[in-house]
Swiss-Prot record:
Protein's recorded name: Large ribosomal subunit protein bL20
Cited Gene3D superfamilies: 6.10.160.10, Ribosomal protein L20
Domain of life: Bacteria
Species whose genome carries this gene: Methylacidiphilum infernorum (isolate V4) (Methylokorus infernorum (strain V4))
Role played: Binds directly to 23S ribosomal RNA and is necessary for the in vitro assembly process of the 50S ribosomal subunit. It is not involved in the protein synthesizing functions of that subunit.
GO cellular component terms, A-Z: ribonucleoprotein complex; ribosome
Record carries keyword Amino-acid biosynthesis: no
């Protein structure tokens, strides 16, 4: 009896993997064995870094808000506390954008937070 190799399916699987490795350099895009390892690592890194991206952006927003607050004489943590007490519900992403692109609007929010904090 002849040996069954499942050749069509194996070829399809290898072809798909090499197609996914297009754009990689050298033998990582040409040879199945190296392409398989390269794809495994690429997928591992992309999964991991999708999680890290969220942390990095949050840290960036906090740094930008902190810089804008310190320029106006208050620390980041005091400013966030003042915002909460004043009942201003603007997220960090928007605050960071305002601090960088529209400083007049950030000044208004800062003033509101400061007044709201003094009132309570």
């Amino acid at each position: 009896m002849a040996r069954a190799t499942n050749a069509p399916q194996s070829r399809k699987r290898r072809k798909r993997l090499l197609r996914d490795a297009r754009g990689f350099r050298g033998r990582r895009s040409k040879l199945f064995r190296y392409a398989k390892d390269a794809l495994y690592k690429a997928r591992y890194w992309s999964y991991r870094d999708r999680k890290n991206r969220k942390r990095e952006f949050r840290a960036l927003w906090i740094q930008r808000i902190n810089a804008a607050c310190r320029k106006r004489g208050m620390t980041y943590s005091r400013f966030m506390e003042a915002l909460r007490k004043a009942g201003i519900g603007v997220n960090r992403k928007m605050l960071a954008e305002l601090a960088v692109r529209s400083q007049e609007d950030f000044d208004q929010i800062f003033k509101l937070a400061k007044e709201g904090n003094l009132a309570s």
